[in-house]
């Protein structure tokens, strides 16, 4: 009976037209609706943005206070201290492509490909950071050599570990959403929090260790100098209080670091691209590096931002000396810095609105160039505190654009790269790590140029007044040199090919690629189901 039923069924099937038979077999294949636009909630964006604070908190504290800490609190000699700072910066720049290479070789896990780096580097990073601000009791006569090795080791170790946090965090921009607009919005949130991080880092470190200043005495020529004798006769209790103040500040910043990392880990989930997930393994690093460095839009973008970053870093690196010696606003430096950072914080949302309304290239031209008139004003004006505050607030507007725009434009370059090289997964960390590398390279160049220029101008170390040529050199480093670099950077941005029309085309092409990958995945699933049924 069963055999006869099977024969009738086969015979009926043979009488049906092929098209009808195929249609009758298809009900198991449900046509999937196009995916709705992926929208990140405000909570998701805030959790992502908070992850940018640790790098800025620690970097700001180290940038402004490590030198004076090594010299006056840890009692490291000036030459070893300068070696620690220089080697630390050089190592910091080197670790970015190194970590980018390691991440590109990482495989996807249940937590993602980037999150494990963030999770496992965090506890080690805060331990290394805390030990930077700890003064060990070395045996008598070995303080100088042992102290040099101690601070060099933990400074380089911390820079390595914080890079293991920051490079994957930067690359995470590409994996929080497949929508350009959502990534841009999340980047704006991130830049706002990062600027707030610099403000908080400066405030915490500055307020807690504000009393950690070497005493000054009037010398016979009428100039105020740091008294070596006073430093040596400083009471042990007072020095111990200063050391404890640095440890307290380090503990608070380390706690904020952990809290921010915890929020990031809980609130953000990596999203893997469909067309990438179909690739068996990541592209070899050096092959990916050749492709990335051969991608024209990326080279033009980092070249433009290399010049503009160098301009702003010249201002940043010499701002304290400029306020102290050229403008003679010794007691206003922290307040002026706070005015710049608060202005940047409040104007980042405005720049985010501007770039979505008028385009990113337009935002670059207006945002970066807006600093030029105020830099000219600083170069020409006489000493005036009110005008200086106005310039500081206006400078914050440009700083906000300089913070936001590179990180908003990098994802566009990566999207363009993926369209040209769709079978090259794992290259995102290379893009971000080498951008950070070139940024830190610019920081090192600005430090070297500034120090050399001041040395040629006969800068008097530890003095509270300087020769006129030093004041003039500082004015050039803070005004004319940045103006020239900004103009060169803007000229390079003229060559940058990804405008708003190109972005829209890339967005449509990427969407088509995702839909193709999705339908391919559905076909593979249906084939597997059919095979199991048969």
From Swiss-Prot:
GO (cellular component) term, any one: cytoplasmic ribonucleoprotein granule
Summary of the knockout phenotype: Mice are born at Mendelian ratios, but show increased postnatal mortality early in life. Mice are smaller, leaner and have decreased serum, liver and brown adipose triglycerides. After weaning, mice display motor dysfunction with front-paw clasping during tail suspension. Brain size and weight are also significantly lower. Behavioral tests indicate that mice have deficits in learning, and short- and long-term memory, as well as severe anxiety, a phenotype related to omega-3 fatty-acid deficiency.
Outcome reported for the amino acid change (mutating residue 216 to A): Significant reduction in LPC transport
Cytoplasmic compartment segments: 1-39, 102-113, 174-180, 267-297, 355-358, 421-430, 494-534
Effect recorded for residue 56 to A: Slightly reduced LPC transport
Membrane recorded as keyword: yes
Effect of residue 440 to A: Abolishes LPC transport
Superkingdom in the source lineage: Eukaryota
UniProt-listed GO biological process terms: brain development; carbohydrate transport; cellular response to starvation; cognition; energy homeostasis; establishment of blood-brain barrier; fatty acid transport; hippocampus development
Gene Ontology MF term list: fatty acid transmembrane transporter activity; long-chain fatty acid transmembrane transporter activity; lysophosphatidylcholine flippase activity; lysophospholipid:sodium symporter activity; oleate transmembrane transporter activity; symporter activity
Recorded consequence of changing residue 67 to H: Abolishes LPC transport
Catalytic activity: a 1-acyl-sn-glycero-3-phosphocholine(in) + Na(+)(in) = a 1-acyl-sn-glycero-3-phosphocholine(out) + Na(+)(out); 1-(4Z,7Z,10Z,13Z,16Z,19Z-docosahexaenoyl)-sn-glycero-3-phosphocholine(in) + Na(+)(in) = 1-(4Z,7Z,10Z,13Z,16Z,19Z-docosahexaenoyl)-sn-glycero-3-phosphocholine(out) + Na(+)(out); 1-(9Z-octadecenoyl)-sn-glycero-3-phosphocholine(in) + Na(+)(in) = 1-(9Z-octadecenoyl)-sn-glycero-3-phosphocholine(out) + Na(+)(out); 1-hexadecanoyl-sn-glycero-3-phosphocholine(in) + Na(+)(in) = 1-hexadecanoyl-sn-glycero-3-phosphocholine(out) + Na(+)(out)
Chief location of this protein within or outside the cell: membrane
Subcellular location: Cell membrane; Endoplasmic reticulum membrane
Cystine connections: 216-464
Induction or repression: By fasting in liver and brown adipose tissue as well as by cold exposure in brown adipose tissue. Expression following fasting is dependent on glucagon signaling and Ppara.
Keyword annotations: Cell membrane, Disulfide bond, Endoplasmic reticulum, Glycoprotein, Lipid transport, Membrane, Symport, Transmembrane, Transmembrane helix, Transport
Glycosylated residues (UniProt): 221, 231
Consequence of changing residue 82 to A: No effect on LPC transport
Keyword Nucleus belongs to the record: no
InterPro entries: MFS_2, MFS_trans_sf
Topology feature Extracellular, residues: 70-80, 134-148, 213-232, 325-335, 381-383, 458-469
Function statement: Sodium-dependent lysophosphatidylcholine (LPC) symporter, which plays an essential role for blood-brain barrier formation and function. Specifically expressed in endothelium of the blood-brain barrier of micro-vessels and transports LPC into the brain. Transport of LPC is essential because it constitutes the major mechanism by which docosahexaenoic acid (DHA), an omega-3 fatty acid that is essential for normal brain growth and cognitive function, enters the brain. Transports LPC carrying long-chain fatty acids such LPC oleate and LPC palmitate with a minimum acyl chain length of 14 carbons.
Family stated for the protein in its record: Belongs to the major facilitator superfamily.
Protein's recorded name: Sodium-dependent lysophosphatidylcholine symporter 1
Species for this entry: Mus musculus (Mouse)
Classification of source organism: Eukaryota, Metazoa, Chordata, Craniata, Vertebrata
């Amino acid at each position: 009976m069963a055999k006869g039923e099977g024969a009738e069924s086969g015979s009926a099937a043979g009488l049906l037209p092929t098209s009808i038979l195929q249609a009758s077999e298809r009900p198991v294949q449900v046509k999937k609706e196009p995916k709705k636009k992926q929208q990140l909630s405000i909570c998701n964006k805030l959790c992502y943005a908070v992850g940018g604070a640790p790098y800025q908190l620690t970097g700001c504290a180290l940038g402004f206070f490590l030198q004076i800490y090594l010299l006056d609190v840890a009692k490291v000699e000036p030459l070893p201290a300068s070696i620690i700072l220089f080697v630390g910066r050089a190592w910091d720049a080197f670790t970015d492509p190194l970590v980018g290479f390691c991440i590109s070789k990482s495989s996807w896990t249940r937590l993602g490909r980037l999150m494990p780096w963030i999770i496992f580097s965090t506890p080690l990073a805060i331990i290394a950071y805390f030990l930077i601000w700890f003064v060990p009791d070395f045996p008598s006569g070995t303080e100088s050599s042992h102290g040099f090795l101690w601070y060099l080791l933990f400074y380089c170790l911390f820079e390595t570990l914080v890079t293991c946090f920051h490079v994957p965090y930067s690359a995470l921009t590409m994996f929080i959403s497949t929508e350009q607009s959502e990534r841009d919005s999340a980047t704006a949130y991130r830049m706002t929090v990062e600027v707030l991080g610099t403000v908080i880092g400066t405030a915490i470190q500055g307020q807690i260790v504000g009393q950690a200043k070497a005493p000054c005495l009037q010398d016979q020529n009428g100039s105020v100098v740091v008294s070596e004798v006073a430093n040596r006769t400083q009471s042990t209790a007072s020095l111990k209080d200063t050391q404890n103040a640095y440890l307290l500040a380090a503990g608070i910043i380390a706690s904020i670091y952990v809290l921010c990392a915890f929020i990031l880990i809980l609130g953000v989930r990596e999203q893997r691209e469909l067309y990438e997930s179909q690739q068996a393994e990541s592209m070899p690093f050096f092959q990916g590096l050749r492709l990335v460095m051969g991608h024209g839009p990326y080279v033009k973008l980092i070249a433009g931002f290399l010049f503009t970053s160098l301009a702003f870093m010249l201002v940043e690196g010499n701002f304290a000396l400029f306020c102290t010696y050229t403008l003679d606003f010794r007691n206003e430096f922290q307040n002026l810095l706070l005015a710049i950072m608060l202005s940047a914080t409040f104007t980042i949302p405005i720049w985010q609105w501007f770039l979505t309304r008028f385009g990113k290239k337009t935002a670059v031209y207006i945002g970066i160039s807006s600093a030029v008139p105020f830099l000219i004003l600083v170069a020409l004006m006489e000493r005036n505190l009110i005008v200086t505050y106005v310039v500081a607030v206006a400078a914050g507007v440009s700083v906000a654009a300089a913070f936001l725009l590179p990180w908003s434009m990098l994802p566009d370059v990566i999207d363009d790269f993926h369209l040209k090289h769709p079978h090259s997964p794992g290259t995102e960390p290379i893009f971000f790590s080498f951008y950070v590398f070139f940024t830190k390279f610019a920081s090192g160049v600005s430090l070297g140029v500034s120090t050399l220029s001041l040395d040629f101008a006969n800068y008097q170390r530890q003095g509270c007044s300087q020769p006129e040529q030093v004041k003039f050199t500082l004015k050039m480093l803070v005004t004319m040199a940045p103006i020239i670099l900004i103009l060169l950077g803007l000229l390079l941005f003229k060559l940058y090919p990804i405008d708003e029309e190109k972005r829209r085309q890339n967005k449509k092409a990427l969407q088509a690629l995702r839909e193709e990958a999705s339908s391919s995945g559905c076909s593979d699933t249906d084939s597997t189901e059919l095979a199991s049924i048969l």
